[in-house]
A protein has these predicted regions:
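HIT superfamily nucleotide-processing domains
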Residues: 1-113
Length: 113
């Protein structure tokens, strides 16, 4: 089994963190300011997270948004987590994408309800 890149984070500068989770800028951003929030404990997806880990992700999500709003001034956000290879997950360590969106940018993600 290969080592999990989100457990080691080689060469990655931590943007924000709390006791159970941390945030850093995505190495392959969809847009300017794209951040990933990951749990410090290695778990493969959001459904394995404890209530405490979910709360820590929520806490960082708010703090990340505040910082990105100050620096990048986006017009909106996409926030999400892929679970399983069929959904597009390629790194099997829980991570939540926080993707700032800007008026007129390409690649709009739309979920139909």
């Amino acid at each position: 089994m290969s080592e999990c890149i989100f457990c080691t984070l080689p060469g990655i500068k931590i943007f924000l963190e709390n006791e159970l989770s941390l945030a850093f800028f995505d190495k392959f951003p969809v847009s300017k300011g794209h951040v990933l929030i990951v749990t410090k404990r290695h778990i493969s997806n959001i459904f394995e997270a404890t209530s405490e880990e979910m709360a820590s992700i929520g806490d960082l999500l708010k703090k990340v948004k505040e910082e990105l709003d100050k620096t990048y001034h986006p017009d909106g956000y996409n926030v999400g987590a892929n679970t399983g290879s069929t959904s597009g997950q390629t790194i099997f360590h829980l991570h939540v994408h926080v993707i700032p969106r800007y008026q007129g940018d390409a690649g709009t993600v739309r979920w139909h309800t």
